[in-house]
Amino acid sequence: DLHPANVVVSDGTLSGVNDFGDMFAGDPAWDLAAAWVILPDGAASRFFDAYARADEATIRRARGLAALKSLFLMLMGHNGDRGLPGGKPTRGPAGRAALDRVLHWRAGAGAARA
């Protein structure tokens, strides 16, 4: 369940991951989607370079999953801005940034911008 709330960073370095309740072996599109959502601009390219090559169908699924996760984060932020239950105002900007990375990614040259 990799998303910004479950990743712990200390001084700009990954120091932990929380919430392994949804961990499973399965579609690699989930791993690729997580990279778009949790990594900052430019950092995802290293992940994509290190990850085994994914075919076009996997990348399409990953982009869809990343967009879905991003929209969910934006909804949490929206709800937090309005004081609604379960809302977290800090999630909105993270969701917007992730969605921007997903929408502007291009195959080939795009991995460097991911």
Q: What is each stretch, according to the model?
A:
Residues 1-32:
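Active-site acidic catalytic loop and adjacent metal/ATP-binding pocket
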Residues 22-25, 34-114:
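Helix-rich C-terminal or lid/interface subdomains of diverse kinases
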